[in-house]
Curated annotation (Swiss-Prot):
Belongs to the small heat shock protein (HSP20) family. It comes from the Bacteria. The gene is hspC2. Residues 43-154 form the sHSP domain. It comes from Rickettsia felis (strain ATCC VR-1525 / URRWXCal2). Pfam families: HSP20 (PF00011). Keywords: Stress response. This is Small heat shock protein C2.
């Protein structure tokens, strides 16, 4: 009587299978990414989504947003209902429009990034500064209320 057990494979066979599977996954990812972005953009025209770091200290939150090549006057920051929205525009230089590009990887156009903030912020004291292509936003936390005893009356 023979057992119908799967064959034990060595490490290199498993590794090769995983590499093939990853390659196929990448092919499908590329295909569907192109499919879902068409006709709004092509692989050479990607949306400008600013890279953002958010950190927290005891006193507040700090955001650092990369905005290289953007002028300070083209940045707009708003807060509404604990949602911080950063909008901007990166203009393409008009003299560059007539060039015959062989490769084009820089981003141009408008962008918007919205970040939901926690409820414990003091939105009246938010500060922003723009330096060397980095937007620094400081969001202080509200001061915690002190506990007080409430007398129960009969």
């Amino acid at each position: 009587m023979a057992f119908n057990l799967p064959r034990i494979r060595n490490k290199s066979e498993v590794s090769n299978d995983l590499m093939r599977r990853n390659h196929l996954d990448n092919i499908f990812d590329d295909f569907f990414n192109e499919f879902y972005t068409f006709p709004y953009s092509s692989s050479t025209e990607k949306n400008l989504i600013p890279r953002t770091d958010i950190s927290e200290t005891d006193s507040g939150y700090s955001l650092e947003v990369e905005l290289p090549g953007i002028n300070q006057k083209d940045i707009d920051i708003n807060i509404d209902n604990h949602i911080l929205t950063i909008k901007g525009q990166k203009e393409e230089k008009s003299e560059e429009k007539n060039k015959n590009y062989h490769m084009r990887e820089r981003y141009y156009g408008s962008f918007q990034r919205s970040i939901s903030l926690p409820a414990n912020i003091n939105d009246d004291a938010i500060n922003a500064r723009f330096e060397n292509g980095i937007l620094h936003i400081t969001i202080p936390k509200k001061e915690q209320g002190k506990t007080r005893k409430i007398e129960v009356k009969g």
